[in-house]
Amino acid sequence: PDSGAEVRRLDLQINVHQPTRLQETVWTLERFFPHFAFFNSDIPAAQMYLYHTRLFPLAYGEYTIDDNGWLSGFIVDDRFDAVEYPCPQLTVMTMRNVHDTVAPKYQCVLQLEISYDGVSYLLEQEDPGEALQTLNWHLQRCDPDVILSDWGDASLMPFLRSLSDRLKIPLLLNRDPNAGYFTTKESSYFTYGKIVHKDGAFELAGRWHLDAQNSFIMDKSDFEGLFELARLTQIPVQHQARTSIGTGLSSMQHSWAYRNNVLIPANKREPEDFKPA
């Protein structure tokens, strides 16, 4: 072709008014328009909202909620990079499988140990329905802001959900009874010369579920380090707990790009190749 020929480019901006359908919409467009280059399309909706509003997790300020329960306004008296900042006093319930060596689905008797307010309770009933009812009673009594589990993502939470579905007994894991659970599939990836397995996520609505066994950040720095990273990266706390430091750094770059009207290309990641020693 003539090197001096005019190259025509078509730019389209598409807005998705229902955030929960953002990823579905992107997948549909990518399937029907494979030759298009997409930008700002693979950023999670929650992070996009925080980039757009310049809010960040645990931002201290005044928030206005309308009659429908929607956020209608806010005045933030905080900075994401503040060294000293107030943190909310969170109610924490710990939850673990008594027999960690045996996956819950293979146990004849459901045995859970939950702890809150300095007291531990053993839920051990041969009738799984009774165990779920007792768990719901403790959830209502404690009303935790955070459920801290061991192996909750991989086995405990999925098992409780399947048990709840089978017995038709609603679980009160979410504060919002109309909300579902946010789950992702387990994955394996190659990095720094080795294959790493990562459990899928099991996140809640209205309260946080943090799996101490599926969070490098919680293992090394506990709540203080998690909160600091979530504020800096603008990644919601539950998701930040399960991500790597590299993902957090990428989010900080994306936030800067979004604020400065720089388009972020989708599908940027390339598989890592072997490197010489």
Where are these regions (language model features)?
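The two-metal-ion catalytic cores of nucleic-acid processing enzymes
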Residues: 1-277
